[in-house]
UniProtKB/Swiss-Prot annotation:
InterPro entries, alphabetized: DNA-dir_RpoC_beta_prime, DNA-dir_RpoC_beta_prime_bact, RNA_pol_asu, RNA_pol_N, RNA_pol_Rpb1_1, RNA_pol_Rpb1_3, RNA_pol_Rpb1_3_sf, RNA_pol_Rpb1_4
Catalyzed reactions per annotation: RNA(n) + a ribonucleoside 5'-triphosphate = RNA(n+1) + diphosphate
Binding, Zn(2+) 2: C818, C892, C899, C902
Protein's UniProt name: DNA-directed RNA polymerase subunit beta'
Organism, scientific name: Lactiplantibacillus plantarum (strain ATCC BAA-793 / NCIMB 8826 / WCFS1) (Lactobacillus plantarum)
Function of the molecule: DNA-dependent RNA polymerase catalyzes the transcription of DNA into RNA using the four ribonucleoside triphosphates as substrates.
Any single GO CC term annotated in Swiss-Prot or TrEMBL for this entry: DNA-directed RNA polymerase complex
CDD domains: RNAP_beta'_C, RNAP_beta'_N
Chain positions recorded as Mg(2+) binding sites: D449, D451, D453
UniProt family annotation: Belongs to the RNA polymerase beta' chain family.
Zinc-finger recorded as keyword: no
């Protein structure tokens, strides 16, 4: 076997008949499969051992030669070579056809490749191939035209008239002769001449033909090879036949299809030998053609051949296509051994980097390791004995198992794996029971809960795999989410409520005003019942020497609560003492107002002081982010574990319960509802008098009820008791929100009807009072719609992710700096007066392109080509800078990827991105993963103008597929002033006139359009005239590529930020760059490119560079925006495209062009089984030998620590 890692590239082409015969180990002459009595393959049949190899290892068919010592001998009795039986997976046979047959892919595809080469319509071809018409091959001296079609009757008449002067034929033979007669070089020359003055349809057809003919010329494929004289028979183990219990056989559909071909072929041979009448032979040839069509692509033409139960048979094409096809089922995703799956349960006793593995599972998963160790320790005499011990679960085994799993990480995966955090590594800890235990903080990344979820476990076997799992995939590393760089492991539910309860303050609790010398004393007093967790007390600051207090503060007494003191004890030593949930306290240190000056009375101090709110979920996340920034991975993991333990501990002690008494009624409710009824009556009266339209009435009624619900909600919030458990849950961020409470204690409000419209009839009751039958019935619809929406959304979002990954999978960080001189000018993204994405978020973690100056003092804040970290970003924003020019993926010059500087910081680690990072895949996952959180609806802006604004998931799809947007905005094609907006009620339109410097344009808009400009405004080219979505295809024609890219980026960010989902700009930039990487050639100049060709920008530049060097005229082109599906299919890798969609079309085209797949992306390498060119698979890293490093102790998780150790070792040598 060739070593797949030595492949440079992979090429596909058409197979000539000789090539097919050279692959073959023998001709299959009979349709027999296996003998039903002896179960041995039949001679010359589809499973013949002489052709395909022996069915048993090292054993010929008749049994004369057995054992490996006869390797390579061909048996003189049965003719079978003695070799391994697995050759039956690779040896092919062939069928010698009695008449040529066309290949359906090349005749039927759109456009028909045969039709283009022969310049004939697919309809004419079909008539010839299936023996309905004759075609003139040589016209001789007759008035007939070459390639003219003749019906049976016409043919007989012409034959009688001209005799053998002309030649006509039918079937694939005729097509083959015509194809052989095509002079490709001459055709190409003629077509180039035609192109010089052709236009319209004629030109399009000529370009298409020239494209195919040039493809044949350059690839060295012969057009006649589209017609086959012999067809290959795939190896028998790829189309197996197995015996079921009860003596029946199950076989692959391919065997049936091959049998039909062989039967018809043999019958045709016999008829030809018998010199049968032409019409019978013709019919048999047609049937042979149809049988071969069915074998290659059943159902492409005519009715599909059906098997038992009228099920269409699966042909060779179907074996490749779709989710169950070879590409997606077996090449891109395989089932692996050393894996298991089980239900998950919570493991609060685990550390961040651990998971609980049931003993039975561990025994099976680590079986070979245990066997080896048992033999090594002489607890078993041999491997067989060791295996028996494991199967009987001997006592010796458990001790060995403990040692074997020590420091051997395992991977856990939960489906659906929406982003890279769906697979993480943990160290196993043995647990009893049958459920795997998952660390509660890892739930958020996996989106797991413990209501019956299952997870899969995989064991990395090789040393390299284990090292990679430990250093790169350990759960303790994955603290930040790759999509936005915010912590993804934040305490939730019980942990939040515990820490919330712990940091709560109450006035007048027992022991208030006591002063302690240190935390220990305070804790003892709490345990003995002298003070409460919520009591406000004083603690000597001098007892906390590590904390960053100011010199003045160190002499004072800190006024805090016992709970807060306990909470602060889990934070890293030098971290500020947190006494209030504010950013100031987090970053600048504890405010002075919480310190008792010497001699001051603590009780008076407390009387004057306000209650400080407890620490909520968001603040806990801020703490984690800050600790991560200052202390990195290890300290953060420790803090998280402590926060988890403390949270669970205190939430148990808090004794939080929920009873019906916690839901209190609202006495103002009847009055609010009565007022609403009154308003609704007034509105109805106005409608009856004809003062308002029905639409307006509807809108106003809905408004009234929404106001009523909001009033009730507001009153509820005001009447809340701070120690109400339900309030505590929602306030702390542990579970639920205010609207849940409104439904329990206020009113449920308006519901949507099945058609999606909101019903005017509100539900006035709440769940505490109980709903009436009608109210209950109305509300059930909403519940059902919620479920179906979620299911649809999941499917749509998953498909979106798949397309995104496919288009960006080859974007990898390939170099340090591409040296571009272009940058992206950015400012905050605004929608009206609302900030969608602030400048701080957009510049953080990016490189500057130009120096940033202070707008007031003109001092330099940041030089150029500097990475902007949090401090610099704050500096820039605080100085009042509104626009920064940064390095961006849009302007990166790196071929097939991006460079470190244009990408900036890796959001998942907070450090600079490294060469080899697969940023394209991460970007696709970051955009796709939150897809399930986006809404599915199209919002109606309502009112008279029933404009639909697409939002949520449909809008994202609309943008990335560059479809014509709904609610499209007209854009101005000139820069100038809006002179006039006049309405024309008769035609229900508005005319907008824009006067530019050179010309004036008038645009017609619908009367209901809401204007984005007003008279006298100065606008730029590409500005929207009315409110709506701009069509990017139109924008790219009017403006430049960068403006279009910027617009798309803004639009995507708007959708996500409106729904409260934060995604880093760089992810969106990478996706949009992939949509705009092609250009369409307008004028080829002196290059070899055809006009109208789609080319990669990089290839286009190379082509022009070569032409310029040779002194020719370069080609001109215009940028093209492709939707992601189209962009993924237009990639340079045919393997990647074929495994994505439209498999047969992609392969047909690639074969004719003799395409070469350079194996640049991830997918194509996975398909052929080569190491992927990302991470340690990059060519740069391929030849580094791993160093021997001792055992990595529990505390060391980070790569940088290891690198330091290695450098120190090197230095000491």
């Amino acid at each position: 076997m060739i070593d797949v890692n030595k492949f440079e590239s992979m090429q596909i082409g058409l197979a000539s008949p000789d090539k097919i015969r050279s692959w073959s180990y023998g001709e299959v002459k009979k349709p027999e499969t296996i003998n039903y009595r002896t179960l041995k393959p039949e001679k010359d049949g589809l499973f013949d051992e002489r052709i395909f190899g022996p069915t048993k290892d090292w054993e010929c068919a008749c049994g004369k030669y057995k054992r490996i010592r006869y390797k390579g001998i061909v048996c003189d009795r049965c003719g079978v070579e003695v070799t391994r039986s697995k050759v039956r997976r690779e040896r092919m046979g062939h069928i010698e056809l009695a008449a040529p047959v066309t290949h359906i892919w090349y005749f039927k595809g759109i456009p028909s490749r045969m039709g283009l080469v022969l310049d004939m319509s697919p309809r004419a071809l079909e008539e010839i191939i299936y023996f309905a018409s004759y075609v003139v091959i040589e016209s001789g001296n007759t008035p007939l035209e070459k390639k003219q079609l003749l019906s049976e009757r016409e043919y007989r008449e012409k034959k009688a008239q001209y005799g053998n002067e002309f030649e006509a034929a039918m079937g694939a033979e005729a097509i083959k002769r015509l194809l052989n007669n095509v002079d490709l070089e001459k055709e190409a020359r003629d077509l180039k001449e035609t192109l010089k003055d052709a236009s319209g349809q004629k030109r399009t057809r000529a370009v298409r033909r020239l494209d195919i003919i040039e493809a044949f010329v350059t690839s060295g494929n012969e057009p006649a090879w589209m017609v086959m004289d012999a067809i290959p028979v795939i190896p028998p183990d790829l189309r197996p036949m197995v015996q079921l219990e009860g003596g029946r056989f199950a076989t692959s559909d391919l065997n049936d299809l091959y049998r039909r071909v062989i039967n018809r072929n043999n019958r045709l041979k016999r008829l030809l030998d018998l010199n049968a009448p032409g019409i019978i032979v013709q019919n048999e040839k047609r049937m042979l053609q149809e049988a071969v069509d069915a074998l290659i692509d059943n159902g492409r033409r005519g009715r599909p051949v059906a098997g038992p139960g009228n099920r269409p048979l699966k042909s060779l094409s179907h074996m490749l296509k779709g989710k169950q096809g070879r590409f997606r089922q077996n090449l891109l995703g395989k089932r692996v051994d050393y894996s298991g799956r089980s239900v998950i349960d919570v493991g609060p006793f685990l550390k961040m980097n651990q998971m609980g593995l049931p003993r039975q599972m561990a025994l099976e998963l680590f079986k070979p390791f245990i066997m080896k160790e048992l033999v090594k320790r002489e607890l078993a005499s041999n491997i067989k004995n060791a295996k028996r011990k494991i199967e009987h679960a001997d006592d010796d085994v458990w001790g060995v198992l403990e040692d074997v799993i020590k420091e051997h990480p395992v991977l856990l995966n939960r489906a659906p794996t929406l982003h890279r955090l769906g697979i993480q590594a943990f160290e196993p800890v043995l647990v009893s029971g049958k459920a795997m235990r998952l660390h509660p903080l890892a739930c958020e990344a996996y989106n797991a809960d413990f209501d019956g979820d299952q997870m899969a476990i995989h064991v990395p076997l090789s040393d390299e795999a284990q090292a990679e799992a430990r250093l790169l995939m350990l759960a303790a590393h994955h603290i930040l989410a790759p999509k936005d760089g915010k912590p993804v492991v934040t305490p939730s539910q019980d942990m939040v409520i515990g820490n919330y309860y712990l940091t709560t303050e109450e006035i007048g609790r027992e022991g208030e005003g006591m002063i302690f010398k240190d935390l220990n004393e305070a804790q003892k007093a709490y345990q003995s019942g002298y003070v409460h967790l919520h009591s406000r007390v004083g603690i000597q600051v001098s007892s906390m020497p590590d904390k960053p207090f100011t010199d003045d503060q160190k002499q004072a007494v800190l006024v805090t609560t016992v709970g807060k003191a306990i909470f602060n004890n889990i934070l890293p030593g030098k971290f500020p003492y947190l006494n209030e949930p504010t950013n100031d306290n987090l970053i600048a240190g504890t405010p002075d107002k919480y310190f008792l000056k010497p001699g001051e009375d603590i009780h008076q101090f407390l009387d004057a002081q306000e209650i400080i709110p407890p620490f909520k979920k968001g603040f806990l996340a801020d703490i984690i982010a800050e600790v991560y920034k200052q202390y990195h991975v290890t300290a953060t993991s420790l803090l998280l574990d402590r926060m988890k333990d403390l949270g669970y501990n205190i939430s148990t002690k808090s004794g939080l319960t929920v009873g019906v008494a916690d839901i209190t009624g609202l006495k103002e409710k009847p009055a609010i509802i009565a007022e609403a009824h009154k308003q609704v009556n007034t509105i109805s009266k106005q409608f009856r008098r004809g003062l308002i339209t029905d639409d307006e009435r509807y809108e106003r009624v809905i408004g009234v009820w929404n106001d009523a619900k909001d009033q009730i909600q507001q009153k509820l919030i005001e009447s809340f008791n701070a120690d109400n458990p339900i309030f505590m849950m929602s306030d702390s961020g542990a579970r639920g929100n205010i609207s849940n409470f409104t439904q329990l204690a206020g009113m449920r409000g308006l519901m949507a009807a099945p058609n999606g419209k909101i019903m005017e009839l509100p539900i006035l009751s709440n769940f505490r009072e109980g709903l009436s039958v009608l109210e209950m019935f109305i509300s059930t619809h909403g519940a059902r719609k919620g479920m179906t929406d979620t299911a649809l959304k999941t499917a749509n979002s998953g498909y979106l992710t798949r397309r995104l990954v496919d288009v960006a999978q080859d974007v990898i960080v390939r170099e340090k700096d591409c040296g571009t001189d272009r940058g992206l000018r950015i400012h905050a993204i605004m929608e009206g007066n609302e900030v969608i994405e602030p400048l701080y978020d957009r510049i953080l973690g990016r490189y500057t392109m130009k120096t940033v100056f202070d707008p007031e003092t003109h001092d330099e804040i940041v030089g150029n080509n500097v990475l902007i970290d949090e401090d610099l970003a704050h500096k820039i924003v605080d100085a009042g800078v509104t626009e920064v020019t940064i390095r961006s993926a849009f302007t990166c010059n790196t071929k097939h990827g991006v460079c470190e500087h244009c990408y900036g910081r890796n959001m998942a680690t907070g450090d600079e991105v490294e060469v080899g990072e697969a940023v394209g895949t991460v970007a696709a996952q970051s955009i796709g993963e939150p897809g399930t959180q986006l809404t599915m609806r199209n919002f109606h802006t309502g009112g008279v103008a029933g404009d639909d604004i697409t939002q949520g998931l449909p809008r994202v799809q609309e943008i990335v597929e560059s479809r014509n947007p709904k609610g499209r905005a007209e854009i101005s094609e000139v820069t100038g002033t809006v002179e006039l907006i006049e309405e024309n009620p008769a035609e229900r339109t508005k005319e907008v006139t824009v006067k530019g410097e050179t010309d004036t344009r008038t645009y017609t808009l619908p009367l209901t359009a809401r204007m984005a400009v007003s008279e006298g405004d100065f606008i730029h080219r590409g500005a929207a005239l009315n409110i709506g979505s701009i069509d990017p295809k139109q924008l790219i024609q009017v403006r430049d590529v960068l403006s279009t890219e910027n617009y798309l980026l803004r639009e995507v960010q708007k959708v996500y930020r409106m729904q409260g989902v934060e995604i880093g700009d760089k992810h969106v930039e990478i996706m949009i760059r992939q949509m705009l990487r092609k250009v369409r050639v307008m004028d080829p100049g002196d290059t070899d490119v055809l006009p109208g060709t789609l080319m990669d920008i990089a290839d286009f530049k190379d082509e022009n560079y070569k032409t310029l060097i040779a002194g020719g005229i370069p080609a001109t082109s215009r940028p093209v925006i492709l939707g992601i599906t189209k962009a993924a299919l237009e990639t340079n890798s045919f393997l990647s495209a074929a495994s994505f969609q439209e498999t047969t079309r992609v392969l047909t085209d690639a074969a004719i062009r003799g395409k070469n797949d350079p194996l640049i992306g991830l997918k194509e390498n996975v398909i052929i089984g080569k190491i992927i060119p990302a991470g340690t698979g990059m060519p740069v890293y391929r030849h580094i030998k791993p160093k021997e490093v001792g055992n990595v102790a529990d505390g060391v998780y980070s790569i940088s620590d290891l690198e330091k150790q290695m450098q120190e070792q090197d230095a000491s040598k």
